[in-house]
């Protein structure tokens, strides 16, 4: 039972292969900063603010986030480009896959001279007990992974997207402090974090949007009309991921219909989470080329 749970959970949260980002240097523990001046409307002010663990997945993940914050990863000043990216890990709005979809991504960005800011966005409450949490995931994750109950995840995105918008405001307001260009603040998200990225990219106030966006194997989000001035979007997914047809493809179609710039990569294999040893591992190369083409 435990093995089945871990396989399903790891697939849904989309842990990025450990070897993929091995070129990134290990960094010291990052500075963690709350992004709201006060608890946002609707936020649970109970303690603890979040729960940190490695149980079950045998890698770092966070759950029960009640108040949003960011981890700050700044590159070496000698290679800094002035670009920053807010990173939104996945985890079905139940947890955040901090290692594969957060820390390694930040380190890889730093290697390229880009500042990384891992967003701890608000999540659905789960059992405090690790054992009970794993039982919850055994029940809840499979129908989300196969798409049969994916509609239930949409409402959970609302507070997380609000945190995404606030994260853009927060980082942009401190651009000078972190030696960033305020018009070079991007956002990248994985799975549920892709939904946060897409929702943030379409917020009503254009000043609160990221300047460029990337969504990897995004969950489905009803985006409606996409304006022509929406941020340029890099999207990637795998053909053998059941969520690609209802997540990534409609999002890209909406970007195209609105006349906003978008680049799509569909890899033949990789499933939900870009499994190791598949052609989806090339996404970092494709994303690097996309960034370079935009002088980022």
Question: Which residues fall in each region the model found?
Answer:
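Conserved alpha/beta-hydrolase "acid-adjacent" motif
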Residues: 242-248
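Bacterial N-terminal signal peptides
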Residues: 8-24
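Acidic beta-to-alpha connecting loop that harbors the catalytic carboxylate
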Residues: 39, 239-242, 269-271
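Short beta-strand/loop motif that positions the catalytic acidic residue
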Residues: 234-237
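Primarily recognizes the serine-hydrolase "nucleophile elbow" in alpha/beta-hydrolase
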Residues: 156-230
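Serine-hydrolase catalytic machinery in alpha/beta-hydrolase-like enzymes
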Residues: 39-49, 53-62, 66-69, 76-81, ...
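C-terminal catalytic histidine-bearing segment of alpha/beta-hydrolase fold enzymes
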Residues: 134, 258-296
């Amino acid at each position: 039972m435990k093995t089945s749970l871990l396989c399903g959970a790891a697939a849904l949260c989309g842990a990025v292969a450990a070897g993929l980002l091995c070129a990134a240097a290990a960094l010291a523990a990052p500075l963690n900063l709350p992004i709201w001046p006060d608890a946002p409307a609707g936020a649970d002010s109970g303690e603890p603010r979040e729960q940190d663990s490695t149980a079950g997945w045998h890698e770092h993940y966070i759950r029960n986030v009640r108040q949003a914050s960011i981890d700050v990863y700044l590159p070496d000043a000698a290679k800094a480009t002035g670009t920053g990216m807010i990173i939104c890990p996945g985890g079905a709005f139940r947890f955040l896959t901090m290692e594969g979809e957060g820390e390694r991504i930040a380190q890889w960005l730093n290697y390229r001279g880009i500042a990384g800011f891992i967003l701890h966005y608000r999540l659905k409450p789960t059992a405090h007990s690790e054992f009970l949490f794993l039982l919850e995931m055994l029940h809840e994750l499979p129908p989300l992974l196969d798409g049969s109950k994916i509609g239930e995840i949409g409402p959970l995105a609302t507070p997380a997207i609000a945190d995404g918008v606030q994260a853009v405001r927060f980082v942009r307001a401190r651009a000078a402090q972190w030696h960033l260009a305020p018009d070079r603040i991007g956002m990248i998200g994985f799975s549920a974090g892709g939904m946060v990225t897409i929702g943030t990219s379409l917020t009503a106030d254009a000043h609160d949007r990221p300047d460029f966006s990337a969504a990897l194997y995004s969950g489905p989000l009803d985006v409606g009309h996409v304006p022509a001035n929406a941020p340029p979007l890099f999207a990637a997914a795998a053909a053998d991921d059941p969520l690609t047809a209802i997540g990534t493809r409609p999002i890209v179609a909406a970007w195209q219909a609105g006349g906003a710039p978008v680049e799509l990569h569909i890899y033949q294999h990789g499933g939900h989470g870009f499994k190791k040893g598949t052609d989806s591992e090339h996404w970092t190369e494709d994303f690097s080329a996309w960034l370079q083409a935009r002088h980022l």
